[in-house]
Curated annotation (Swiss-Prot):
GO terms for cellular component: cytosol. Its EC number is 4.1.1.23. It comes from Staphylococcus epidermidis (strain ATCC 35984 / DSM 28319 / BCRC 17069 / CCUG 31568 / BM 3577 / RP62A). GO terms for biological process: 'de novo' pyrimidine nucleobase biosynthetic process; 'de novo' UMP biosynthetic process. It holds the Pfam family OMPdecase. Pathway: Pyrimidine metabolism; UMP biosynthesis via de novo pathway; UMP from orotate: step 2/2. The lineage of its organism: Bacteria, Bacillati, Bacillota, Bacilli, Bacillales. The gene is pyrF. This is Orotidine 5'-phosphate decarboxylase. Substrate binds at residues 10, 31, 58-67, 117, 179, 188, 208-209.
Length: 230
């Protein structure tokens, strides 16, 4: 996966995606989430790859180990660069996910979601019944992910530094919750700017609405790209 900002393609149809991508004349890194993949299926991945873009397939698989392994065997046949599971599924599930993926593809990176960037500490305590800080909960899931042999995690940029310190800078930290200065928070809770994410140790950033819903998406993308790569 190239070290470019990953654009979250939060659209409802393939037509909307292609209308958006037609604005760009350069290779991009894009994220296809559940909403879009379940609407369009593998056909959209093929058409995006023909354009020369890198793809993060963000399905956050979480099921019994055998089911996730078989699902990954199918996803391994797609021309994607990065895929993920939920770390809450446990070490065995993550190990089987990687085994399923590797049966057909040795190049796709696989990472695990720690805590969603929309999660608050109140939700962590009251709804998930995890009685630690968000930081400790995220670090615990990151440790399990590393032990399972995966390539990295999805986390907030705010947790990237401590994960790098304990698990190494090469361990991927793919971080959503990125907002340029002055941008709306939306449903994200633990957010930073692209510059802050880089300083904190993020290896990749994911940006959606500040680009896709911008009146000038190309300009917005290039500003974020410049601040991330500078």
């Amino acid at each position: 996966m190239r070290n470019l900002p990953i654009i979250a393609l939060d659209f409802k149809s393939a037509d909307e995606v292609h209308t958006f991508l037609n604005k760009f004349n350069e290779p991009l890194c894009v994220k296809i989430g559940m909403e879009l993949f379940y609407q369009t299926g593998p056909a959209l991945i093929k058409s995006i790859k023909k354009r020369g873009h890198d793809i993060f397939l963000d399905l956050k698989l979480h099921d019994i180990p055998n089911t996730v392994s078989k699902a990954m065997e199918g996803l391994a046949r797609l021309d994607i660069d990065l895929v993920n599971v939920h770390a809450a599924g446990g070490i065995k599930m993550m190990e089987e996910a990687k085994k399923g993926l590797r049966k057909h593809n040795a190049d796709i990176k696989i990472i695990a979601v720690t805590q969603l960037t929309s999660t608050t500490e109140r939700q962590l305590h009251e709804e998930q019944n995890i009685q630690t800080s968000i930081e400790e909960a995220v670090l615990n899931y990151a440790r399990l992910t590393k032990k399972a042999g995966l390539d990295g995690v999805v986390c907030s940029p705010l947790e990237a530094k401590m994960i790098s310190k304990e698990l190494g800078s090469d361990f991927l930290k793919v971080t959503p919750g990125i907002r340029p200065k002055g941008a709306a928070r939306n449903d994200q809770q633990r957010i930073t700017t692209p510059e802050e994410a880089k300083t904190l140790g993020s290896t990749h950033i994911v940006v959606g609405r500040p680009i896709t819903q911008s009146e000038h998406p190309i300009d917005s993308y290039h500003k974020i790209k410049e601040s991330w790569l500078s």
